[in-house]
Amino acid sequence: MNMKAGEKALDGCDHKTAYSYLGAALSLLPNDHWKSHYDLSLRLNFLMAGAANSCCQYDEAEQILRRGLANARSLYDQLPSYLLLSQILRAQGNVDDAYNTCSFVLLQLGETIPESVAPEAAKTLVEDTLKMYEEVYDDDWLERKMEDETMRTVVKFYGAITFLAFLSRSRYTAICFICKAVQLSLQNGACVYTPLSLLQLMGFAMEDKHAANLYHIAKNALSLLERFDVGGDQISGVFMNFYGRIAWHYEPFQVCGDNLRRGFESGLSSGSNLGFHCAFHVIKTAIISGEKLDSLLKEIDYYLHLLKTYKSELMKNALLISRETVSALIDKGEATSIEAKVFNNSSQEPVFFHQAYRAFWSGYTVRCHHYFEKCSQLSGQYVQFNPFVLKFYHGLNSLDVLKKKKSHTTRYKEVVRDAISAMKDAAANSEW
């Protein structure tokens, strides 16, 4: 009865109640329950770990999962625990450990993990995958479902490792993984993880401009969601990828921001802190779209407070960088700054972008140009900001420089021409 009550509480997103009921159920099992009640122990152990994770008891959740892994009789019985373990490690900032966990599972499932992936190889993979999509995508494919459970598991873990590879390895390694996931779906039919895989790929391909119809493919991926029972944690991933990385090329920033907030709330209500990726994109979009700074500062502080409550490091650095920018624009940080500082930042691109953005609005044109140039040099490795936005502000800043300087203007003129060309492309893609 305690287990059923705990499951019902989990279904209703009442994680603390679930934690209490499931803990009571575990305490009532006999000492030899892994031998005498194996299936029950396996299920109850995993549910308890999930409830502990949702209640921010990460150490306890990890301990429970490792106990389940040690007592599980097969790899397939271990798979749910490995996935949840990788999510817990990722939330705590242990990206390498999370990556290694997913890598280990994929190797056990017969997949190969590359040490590195060259840019040219990644480009070819994307082109081949998009070509396969064009050849396969039709009503017949839409009617097919991926029946092989092992294959569905592989697609799921490829989706999990993609973002981890982006953070801890390289963009090109991440592209390799997500191309494999999408190709498996195209060859064997769609599954519940296919929409997110397609959107992850479109997010990378959109930045490389491999095809003009990528937005249409992304919309098709969204429509696939209606065929499957998708959980709140996956909804937050879908919304983050579509509205945070793709849709804002074509749809108003405000629409994207509103839907990203929905993605954040969906993740939070499901007990998953992966929704904080949506929060990062909410703030990024709000800064660029010109929301009121005072309101924006309060929203950032709200997310930072929740991160502290959830004991999570997910997107903390990115939110702190954004907060420094908003604080500097309000009063140069004199009354609005906080003690928390950015640390161990693995990607320099957001730092350079915010330095350039602050300099632009503060009137420091040379400094602004310096940091936008650094952003451009890194854009092939890390792209967290819309390239059109980078070029827009870089172009405006260069125009301001050209008004003041009459010598050494060749580079600034190139930037302006590039920005105008990019804005024409953006206007052609957008209907608003």
Put a short name on every predicted segment.
Residues 1, 90-176, 212, 287-354, ...:
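Amphipathic helix-loop-helix modules that constitute alpha-helical solenoid scaffolds
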Residues 1-2, 6, 38-41, 45, ...:
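TPR repeat positional signature
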Residues 1-73, 77-88, 97-104, 147-190, ...:
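Extended alpha-helical scaffolding segments used for macromolecular assembly and cargo binding
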Residues 6-7, 23-33, 65-70, 104-114, ...:
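Amphipathic alpha-helical segments of tetratricopeptide repeats
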Residues 8, 12, 51, 87-88, ...:
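Residue-level signature for tetratricopeptide repeat
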Residues 12, 55, 92, 168, ...:
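Structural motif corresponding to the intra-repeat A-B loop/turn of tetratricopeptide repeats
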Residues 12-15, 58, 75, 95, ...:
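TPR-repeat structural position
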Residues 179, 183-189, 202-293, 298-311:
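Hydrophobic, small-residue-rich alpha-helical packing segments that form membrane-like cores
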